[in-house]
């Protein structure tokens, strides 16, 4: 294992491509957006063995609409993982060339398989927002052809909800460890990983759902005995009373407080809820670790020194 401390950096799908209504989704647009995100993370490579994970929410909905009907949604993750990891790798290489950066380790994408329970209640209760934010007219048009679709309010529009079972185990952790041993930066768990069922013979069947990348990343961070777990999102950090006059930002909190707020319904599913659960899961596996939640456009150094974002520790 590497001599450097390990940090798992979970980049939200919006760190690759914005989900705002009407946002451009071309590969070039994603490349530009990704370069901005990675630039804020470059300095981590001086001090950490970095492991990158990423979401696919904005991209997944668009890809699904172009696929054969009744295709398992896990196949969408398989497709988008290739596209997004290519954008991340290309953006990283361009940053190195454009800024004449020397001695940085290469990135290596790792296709990641994650076991889920076929009886998980998440299959019956879709909760994961995917795709871009849609206007009311766009939602109405989709419902004409797909009355079974479910949507949720998100920002200034709506996003579609997809079944999201809980990740149980990262199946190919050895592949990620091999990349680390080779001195490279793994880009793993794209879209939370490809959700699969295992039959009695260990054969994989792709599930009709999408995983939460933060919950999957927490599993990985625990397996790797990571020191820090950085969750990049569209918010400055953790808030209570979100969207109300009593909204309050919390720069430092302990896991017991997160657990209490979570049980009180402070963090809704499909938003901060899974991030809070992921933080608790990682800190249970590594009580000496830290979880940092911060804005995807913030510089990583500020998030790690506590001058920005929210730092969560066990206690």
Which residues does each PLM region occupy?
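C-terminal catalytic "cap/lid" subdomain
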Residues: 2-315
């Amino acid at each position: 294992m590497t001599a450097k401390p390990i940090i798992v950096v979970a980049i939200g799908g919006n760190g690759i491509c914005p989900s705002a209504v009407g946002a451009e989704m071309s590969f070039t647009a994603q490349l530009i957006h990704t370069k901005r995100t990675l630039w804020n993370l470059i300095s981590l490579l001086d001090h950490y063995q970095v492991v990158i994970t990423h979401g696919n929410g904005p991209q997944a909905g668009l890809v699904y609409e172009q696929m054969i009907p009744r295709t398992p949604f896990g196949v969408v993750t398989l497709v988008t993982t290739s596209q997004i990891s290519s954008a991340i790798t290309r953006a990283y290489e361009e940053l190195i060339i454009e800024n004449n950066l020397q001695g940085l380790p290469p990135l290596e994408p790792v296709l990641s398989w994650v076991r889920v329970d076929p009886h998980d209640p998440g299959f019956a209760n879709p909760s994961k927002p995917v795709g871009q934010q849609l206007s009311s007219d766009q939602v109405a048009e989709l419902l004409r052809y797909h009355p079974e679709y479910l949507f949720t309010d998100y920002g200034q529009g709506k996003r579609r909800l997809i079944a999201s079972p809980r990740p149980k185990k990262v199946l190919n952790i050895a592949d990620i460890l091999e990349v680390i041993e080779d001195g490279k930066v793994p880009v793993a768990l794209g879209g939370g990983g490809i959700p699969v069922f295992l039959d009695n013979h260990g054969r994989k069947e792709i599930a009709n759902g999408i995983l939460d990348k933060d919950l999957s990343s927490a599993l990985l961070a625990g397996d790797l005995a990571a020191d820090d777990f950085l969750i990049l999102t569209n918010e400055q950090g953790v808030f209570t009373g979100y969207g109300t006059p009593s909204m309050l930002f919390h720069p430092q909190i302990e896991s017991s407080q997160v657990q209490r707020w979570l049980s009180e319904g402070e963090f809704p599913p499909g938003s901060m809820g899974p991030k809070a659960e992921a933080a608790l899961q990682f800190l249970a596996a590594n009580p000496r670790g830290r979880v940092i939640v911060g804005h995807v456009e913030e510089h990583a150094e500020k998030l790690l020194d506590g001058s920005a974002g929210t730092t969560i520790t066990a206690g």
